[in-house]
Amino acid sequence: MIKVLFVCHGNICRSTMAQYVMQDLVTRHGLAEHFYINSAATSMEEIGNPVHRGTRAKLKEVGIPCGDHRAVQMQRSDYDKYDYIIGMDSWNCRNMMRILGKDPEGKVSLLLDYTDHPRDIADPWYTGNFDATYDDVKAGCEALLTHIQETEGRK
């Protein structure tokens, strides 16, 4: 079982979008039984809140259900629970390391680091552009899945 945790600031926009996009990808590839995919926040600001309406609307538009997710905060213990801990931007990664303390196994990375265009994914909470965020998240999740298939296939 490959365990992936997507992380952003509040766990209501980007990380949740990545969680559901990745779940859709592995399901469509017939790999769902090999993956456990979740998401979390670095902050406590949105804990308990549902998926942002903009994220929910974009996922619905592309035919991806997003369930009844509620925001949770990342914990230090998550390091031992997940194989991949994926941040949406550099600020998230700094805060993830503050929570985790260290990354001896190299589990922490940015989602778009798996693409040919590594960079931060803009937060639609501020930009209002859920289309651009979805495009980045989709590209990142597709590249991450390819990376996992190539890496895990060699083990």
Identify the meaning behind each predicted range.
Residues 1-81, 146-155:
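Conserved active-site segments centered on acidic
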Residues 8, 59, 86-87, 137:
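Hydrophobic structural packing positions in well-ordered secondary structure
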